[in-house]
Design a protein with these regions (language model features):
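Conserved, structured core segments of small domains
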Residues: 1-122
Length: 122
């Protein structure tokens, strides 16, 4: 049986509320699910590139999401600028689908450091 990989979402530290009980609805950098139409997600191999492109100067929290506990449709859509297809969630992220929420540290050069936070590439 094929194991479904976890999906990931980068939340700014100011947007993430670990104590909230409502589903998470921030799509990206302050834009809501309602404004954007979906929530931007990533596969593990895509996270660092997304962080570099959009979150370089932000303090971020890496949300690891169990796709089996997501109730809305996840659709992979091509992002030509990135040369890849990214998962988009067409609904909120249920809190029970969030496996972990980990603040991402910075390396000595100031970049976000995902060492040990993501699975190793196969």
């Amino acid at each position: 049986m094929l194991e479904i990989p976890h999906l990931y979402h980068l939340a700014t530290a100011s947007e993430w509320d670990a104590d909230a009980t409502e589903p998470y609805t921030v799509s990206t950098l302050g834009r809501s699910l309602e404004e954007e139409g979906f929530i931007h997600l990533s596969l593990a191999r895509q996270v660092a590139g997304v962080a570099e492109a959009f979150y370089g100067d932000q303090d971020v929290v890496l949300l690891r999401i169990d796709p089996a506990k997501v109730t809305a449709r996840v659709q992979f859509e091509d992002v030509p600028e990135a040369g890849d297809a990214f998962p988009h969630l067409y609904g909120p992220i249920p809190r029970e689908a969030i496996v972990s929420a980990t603040p991402v540290p910075r390396s000595a050069d100031g970049t976000l450091d995902f060492t040990g936070l993501l699975p190793e590439p196969i």
